[in-house]
């Protein structure tokens, strides 16, 4: 794991921070060393008592096929099992800053910063998709092309359960996490004036790009099933998550997108998450410190 690409490590840590509960790979490795055969047997026995099964049919299957499958797994359901649980993710809170730090044996550094909206639902998710669409080229051009900070310079929408946010990330051979954080801040302020100057035509072009991505014909069964699986995990029996998100993108306004940027990225309107992977070359330069 320590030799894995720095940006991959940072993104993996980011995904772990969005889950409840979560552990990084080091904690799992340490816990594994203490596992005994008796302990494993006790865990398996407890798991079987609470074993739950959810059967969901999708594609070329009939109702009879699904019911037959349900009957076949019914004997394995644990005596203490309740209803299937919904997927659990963190709930962003206004003004909270989370800071994950880790030294790396590799020379490069990586910084990933996320801004998570405490308002959940399709409207928030739509605004984040549109905001990322407006910022992706600008972030890459500034930090990768102009400042040449690293191999990877990217923005990305953050989608978790019913929540959403926006993230920025760089892997760099020329700056530690503190230096990268300074360049991120410089970009954030510059981007505000750029967002305020976005034309209606550019915004509509970004909107149509997002809508095209959401409504395109799936290339694989797995791609088509992904949206249904998300609804299933969240207990959305209407299975209309994609339709609701598409409708929210269609009605979102440029003013709403700019305001959410001002509130979340430049203000303390949500939860701010830093993932810092400090390369060995920059260990003496210190960490980014954001309050």
Go through each PLM region and give its residues.
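Glycine-centered hinge/linker elements that transmit conformational signals in sensory
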Residues: 69-83
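Buried hydrophobic packing residues in well-ordered domains
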Residues: 40, 55, 113, 129, ...
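C-terminal regions of mature proteins
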Residues: 13-16, 25, 29-35, 39-73, ...
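His/Glu-based metal-binding/catalytic segments typifying zinc-dependent metallopeptidases
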Residues: 10, 15, 80-138
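M16/insulysin-pitrilysin zinc metalloprotease superfamily fold
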Residues: 134, 138, 142, 158-218
């Amino acid at each position: 794991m320590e030799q894995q690409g720095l940006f991959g490590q940072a993104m993996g840590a980011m995904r772990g921070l969005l889950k409840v509960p979560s552990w990084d790979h080091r904690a799992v490795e340490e816990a594994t060393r203490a596992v005994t055969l008796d302990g494993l047997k006790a865990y398996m026995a407890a798991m079987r008592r609470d074993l739950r099964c959810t059967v969901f049919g999708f594609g070329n299957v009939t109702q009879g096929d699904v019911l037959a499958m349900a009957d076949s797994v019914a004997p394995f359901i644990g005596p203490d099992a309740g209803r299937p649980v919904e997927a659990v993710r963190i709930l962003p809170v206004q003004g909270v800053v989370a800071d994950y730090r880790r030294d790396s044996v590799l020379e490069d550094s990586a910084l990933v910063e996320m801004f998570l909206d405490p308002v959940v639902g399709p409207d928030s998710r739509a605004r984040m998709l549109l905001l990322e669409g407006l910022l992706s080229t600008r972030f890459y051009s500034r930090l990768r092309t102009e400042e040449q900070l690293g191999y990877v310079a990217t923005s990305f929408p953050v989608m978790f359960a019913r929540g959403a946010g926006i993230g920025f990330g760089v892997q760099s051979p020329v700056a530690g996490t503190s230096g990268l954080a300074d360049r991120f801040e410089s970009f954030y302020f510059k981007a505000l004036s750029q967002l305020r100057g976005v034309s209606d035509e550019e915004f509509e072009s970004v909107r149509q790009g997002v809508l095209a991505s959401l409504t395109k014909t799936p290339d694989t069964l797995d791609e088509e099933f992904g949206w249904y699986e998300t609804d299933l995990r969240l207990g959305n029996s209407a299975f209309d998550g994609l339709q609701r998100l598409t409708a929210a993108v269609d009605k979102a306004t440029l003013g709403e997108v700019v305001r959410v940027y001002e509130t979340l990225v430049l203000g303390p309107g949500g939860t701010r998450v830093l993932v810092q992977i400090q390369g060995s070359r920059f260990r003496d330069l210190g960490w980014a410190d954001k309050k």
